[in-house]
């Protein structure tokens, strides 16, 4: 495996990390803003409420997006293993 192939795989890995982390980050951000807005409007200043709602939203997002995430990661792993096997 030469340097250009290695650079290509690392670049592809960084894009995969970006795309697979994006759903969780977006959901956490949106839920955080909404909960903060509701807390400001109702003058409830309990931090555990925000934490628990975010945690629940992230868990649901991970459960829903798990097939997509695992498919992407498994395809990348297969691709890497095949390339390593070719150069054995």
Swiss-Prot record:
NCBIfam families: fliQ_rel_III (TIGR01403), PRK15350.1 (NF011877)
Topology with respect to the bilayer: Multi-pass membrane protein
Function in brief: Part of a type III secretion system.
UniProt record, GO biological process: bacterial-type flagellum assembly; protein secretion
Transmembrane stretches, start-end: 15-35, 55-75
Location of the protein in the cell: Cell membrane
Main location: membrane
Pfam families (UniProt xref): Bac_export_3
Keywords: Cell membrane, Membrane, Protein transport, Transmembrane, Transmembrane helix, Transport
Similarity comment: family membership: Belongs to the FliQ/MopD/SpaQ family.
Name the record gives this protein: Secretion system apparatus protein SsaS
Gene name per UniProt: ssaS
A Gene Ontology cellular-component term: plasma membrane
Provenance organism: Salmonella typhimurium (strain LT2 / SGSC1412 / ATCC 700720)
InterPro entries, per database record: Bac_export_3 (IPR002191), T3SS_HrpO (IPR006306)
